[in-house]
Amino acid sequence: MSICKHGAPFVVQHENRYGSGASQSSLLSKSIHHISNSHEAINFISCYSANGSCFSNAQMLANASGSPVIGYYGKVNKLTASLANSGRIFRPQHKLAANICYVGNRLLSAP
C-alpha cells in the first residue's frame, strides 16, 4: 500500500490540514484501516518522512498503524520512491519508546 502526502520534517498534511507527524499519523492510520486490515508494509511517499529517525513521521505512522513503514529522506516523489534502496523501513516500537518518540515528534513540529 502506498500513501502520498505533502510533508516537511516532523509535519504532514492530511485532509488539507498540517499537523505534527504524531497527530496526523493517527488520522492516517484510521483511514488505512477503513481500506485494509493487512499488516503489509506501507510505502509513505512524503518528503522528509524518514528525517528524524525515531522521531520521524514514518516512525509515527509505523507506531500508529502497527505496520512497517517505508519513509524517505529529503524530497521525494513517486518516481524517486520507486528507485531501489531509496527508502528506510521503520517498524512499530514498544509502547514506552513509542510514547517518548510521539512527544519528541510533537515538540519538534512546533513553530
Locations of regions flagged by a protein language model:
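Catalytic-core segments of thiol-dependent peptidases
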Residues: 1-53, 101-102, 107-110
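Active-site-proximal C-terminal subdomain of hydrolase catalytic domains
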Residues: 41-111
